[in-house]
A protein has these predicted regions:
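Conserved N-terminal structural module of periplasmic/extracytoplasmic solute-binding proteins
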Residues: 8-9, 19-120, 124-125, 137-139, ...
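Conserved C-terminal helix/tail region of periplasmic/extracytoplasmic solute-binding proteins
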Residues: 82, 180, 202, 340, ...
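Extracytoplasmic/periplasmic solute-binding protein
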Residues: 157-165, 170, 194-243
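Hinge/lid segment of periplasmic solute-binding proteins
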Residues: 114-171, 185, 194, 221, ...
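Glycine-centered hinge/linker elements that transmit conformational signals in sensory
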Residues: 199-200, 240-271
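Extracytoplasmic/periplasmic substrate-binding proteins
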Residues: 55-56, 63-71, 118-120, 256-341
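A structural signal for short loop-to-beta-strand junctions that line the ligand-binding cleft
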Residues: 100-101, 108-109, 138-177, 206-209, ...
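Extracytoplasmic/periplasmic substrate-recognition and gating elements
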Residues: 49, 72-73, 77, 81-84, ...
Length: 443
């Protein structure tokens, strides 16, 4: 691979050259799938011996739990050796290892991959299967949730090269007892949301818990309005320098929202030093009236929801603006890719087997939503059944800014959004600064 491509990958992973050279072994557990994939999986007669897989996961991760059972059962049925897993839990270490496999053209049969620079690099070497075509082949394309499928569409050609790990959806939990105390209803617009926050604060309640130490949490509030109003148009136009925060109505709505939430005291005290674990403990421990959460916290919410203490609502509409119909951020997690160079008949059989049994693994083994619109089994937590109507007909995926922006601009905006939330600058000052970041970092 050319050094230009390598440099792009390093930038996408936030890595340095020294990290690339020294970090490839850190954080690995399980067997190694090193060497040329065709050599490690085939015998002397060329017949496949086993299936190799690289995952950004630990042994407790939902994706590992699902794939471990599927691959093990399939391998036993086909008389193959047990599947060979290589697990790396750290993000930076995983990116490093995947880059090495791509650069040396030795990708395993199956590997985890983000939709962006890494999937593009795998596509450049012919190392990634068109998942959309394969879903069509096995008759499962129309069974997949449309928003999850949309999440993995390639920005260059519109094809889908990654299989979702699950259907993940995000929404707000709220304390029903607190809302009832002040005769409040779940807000459907941001003006209603802010009015609710004001009522709660005026009565001595903490309106909203936020994990302000996590960059993505504050950025959600910055990007909610642009997402509801433009989907990905604003952020992509901003990156291409075709749109600015200062002149885009959706972007200005987002900046105003974050500024108001922070400066009016609607977040908990010390929110910038609160990480996700601490914020979770605060809310489910009885602090705060609202919390931006998601399907990954069904377990934590289960008892309170069963006792009638919790309700949920979707991302509110932007008042006076045209909002897209989808109002629940939906994404497919870290994608799964199949190596086109080792995608033989056995792997094609496994893909079909995986699609036909994936929902079972999601619900029975991992307790997550399936990316397929299959009927849910009985006996799940009630939240699974009650949340499903939020997304079952959704067509548009969530658009996350933190995996679209270059690393320098992302760092700049993260620093600036903290100033905005603290009231150290006005929305107009934030917008002007953000507009300059993309110009400076493109030089």
């Amino acid at each position: 691979m050319k050094m230009k491509k390598l440099g792009a990958l390093l930038l996408a992973g936030g890595m340095t050259m020294s990290t690339l050279l020294t970090g490839c072994g850190n954080g690995a557990s399980g067997s190694s799938a090193g060497g040329n994939a065709s050599q490690t999986e085939s015998g002397s007669n060329g017949e496949r011996k086993k299936i190799t897989i690289l995952m950004r996961a630990s042994e407790t991760s939902a994706k590992y739990i699902i794939m471990k059972k599927l691959l093990t059962d399939f391998s036993e049925e086909k008389g193959l050796e047990p599947p060979e897993f290589e697990l790396i839990s750290g993000d930076a270490d995983y990116v490093t290892k995947l880059q090495l496999y791509i650069n040396s053209n030795t990708l395993p049969d199956i590997y985890g991959c983000a939709n962006g620079a890494l999937s593009a690099a795998a596509k450049d070497i012919g190392g990634i299967v068109n998942i959309g075509d394969e879903l069509e082949r096995v008759g499962k394309k129309d069974d997949m949730n449309a928003a999850v499928y949309d999440f993995f569409k390639d920005k260059d050609d519109g094809n889908v090269y990654l299989f979702p790990e699950a259907l993940n959806c995000e929404f707000f939990f709220y304390r029903k007892d607190i809302f009832e105390k002040y005769n409040l209803e779940a807000p459907t617009t941001w003006n209603e949301f802010l009015d609710t926050c004001k009522t709660l604060k005026d009565n001595g309640e903490i309106p909203l818990i936020v994990a302000g130490k996590e960059n993505w949490q504050l950025m959600r509030y910055l990007s909610f309005a642009p997402w509801r109003m433009t989907k990905d148009q604003f952020i992509m136009d901003y990156i291409d320098q075709k749109a600015t925060f200062s002149e885009n109505a959706a972007a200005k709505e987002g900046a105003d929202l974050l500024y108001t939430l922070g400066t009016e005291g609607y977040f908990q005290g010390g929110f910038l030093s609160t990480d996700y674990t601490a914020a979770t403990d605060l809310f489910f421990g009885g602090n705060g009236a609202m919390w931006y959460s998601g399907s990954g916290q069904i377990t934590q919410a289960s008892e309170m929801y069963k006792n009638g203490q919790l309700g949920f609502f979707a991302v509110p509409d932007v008042d006076g603006q045209e909002n897209m119909e989808t109002n629940v951020p939906i994404h497919g997690g870290f994608g799964t890719a199949f190596n086109a160079k080792t995608y033989d008949d056995t792997m094609k059989e496994f893909f079909e087997y995986m699609c036909n049994h994936y929902s079972e693994g999601c619900y029975n083994d991992a307790q997550v939503f399936s990316p397929f619109n299959d009927e849910m089994p009985e006996g799940l937590d009630q939240l699974f059944y009650d949340l499903q109507p939020l997304f079952e007909n959704a067509t548009d995926a969530w658009v996350s800014w933190d995996d679209k922006l270059d690393s320098a601009t992302l760092t700049n905006i993260v620093d600036e959004q903290q100033k905005l939330a603290q009231g150290k600058e006005t929305p107009e000052e934030f917008e002007a600064a953000a507009d300059q970041f993309i110009i400076n970092n493109s030089k």
